């Protein structure tokens, strides 16, 4: 099953890191967040990806062109027109196929998905997620849930951590508990979607996929939510970037479900 990764946004709230590269190329533990997402899907035997590029697309293209030459020794035979051999073949992602598609600098999310329709056959089911969110969601259980209902779309729904402290008080307004972080009670769409080919019928030119396309699918009663109570964290701010790197450096990254 192919997976679309939306990787074309500007990342304007993380200008410290995204001035010269797109947000999916911002590194966590020395690896782009895009790599972490690929590793998660690969853990569940998902091997085909379509990366929808836009802002600073050259950075993504160059990363994949150079992928096999990163982090390993290279042997170059200068007598044979610079014949190149990689001394240590990477074990990670070595059987993965990635299509890099330029979907425009200012395209909305729905438009980016619409532009890669050509890479799918009629009737094909596929997945989609965002290039800046990490989770330990069980991809196989997500697929199984999608196949269990008659809708054409499933998104993963989670209760995110509040950015504010959460307090509880008694009848006299005495504070009885104070948590630095609490969870918002309403669930949100965190990506990690499974979509049927018919969803393309709902995408109009330059649609916002979340605010327009999915609303139309939901109004036709064809959209379902897969509840996820585990870890999810977007990288929307510099503070979140620092926190994700701190978790990785301490070997406490909840999204790292694969083995080294």
Tell me what each language-model feature is.
Residues 1, 47, 122-125, 221:
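Short coil/turn segments at beta-strand junctions that form active-site/ligand-binding loops
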Residues 3-5, 51, 128, 153-156, ...:
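Structural beta-sheet core signal
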Residues 1-69, 100:
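N-terminal glycine-rich phosphate-binding loop and ensuing alpha1 helix
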Residues 59-170:
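Conserved beta-loop-beta/alpha segment of the NTase-like Rossmann-fold superfamily
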Residues 124-127, 134-135, 139-147, 158-162, ...:
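Catalytic-core segments of class I nucleotidyltransferases/pyrophosphorylases
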Residues 33-36, 112-115, 213:
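Well-ordered alpha-helical segments embedded in enzymatic catalytic cores
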Residues 25, 166-169, 214, 225:
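A structural signal for short hydrophobic beta-strand segments in well-ordered beta-sheet cores
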């Amino acid at each position: 099953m192919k997976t679309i990764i939306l990787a074309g946004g500007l990342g304007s709230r993380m200008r410290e890191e995204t001035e010269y590269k797109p947000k999916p190329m911002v590194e966590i533990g020395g690896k782009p967040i895009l790599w972490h997402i690929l590793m998660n899907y690969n853990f569940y035997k998902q091997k085909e990806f379509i990366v929808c590029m836009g802002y600073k697309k050259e950075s993504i293209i160059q990363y994949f062109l150079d992928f096999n030459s990163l982090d390993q020794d290279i042997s170059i035979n200068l007598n044979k027109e610079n014949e190149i051999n990689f001394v240590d073949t990477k074990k990670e992602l070595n059987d993965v196929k990635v299509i890099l598609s330029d979907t425009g600098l200012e395209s909305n999310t729905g438009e980016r998905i619409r532009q890669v329709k050509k890479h799918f056959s009629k009737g094909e089911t596929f997945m989609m997620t965002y290039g800046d969110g990490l989770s330990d969601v069980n991809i196989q259980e997500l697929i199984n849930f999608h196949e269990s209902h008659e809708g054409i779309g499933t998104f993963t729904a989670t209760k995110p951590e509040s950015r504010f402290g959460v307090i509880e008080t008694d009848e006299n307004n005495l504070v009885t508990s104070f948590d630095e972080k609490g969870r918002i009670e309403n669930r949100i769409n965190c990506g990690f979607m499974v979509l049927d080919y018919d969803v393309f019928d709902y995408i109009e030119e330059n649609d916002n996929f979340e605010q327009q396309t999915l609303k139309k699918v939901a109004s036709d009663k064809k959209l379902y939510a897969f509840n996820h109570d585990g870890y999810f964290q977007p990288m929307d701010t510099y503070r979140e970037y620092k926190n994700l790197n701190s978790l990785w450096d301490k070997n406490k990254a909840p999204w790292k479900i694969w083995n080294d």
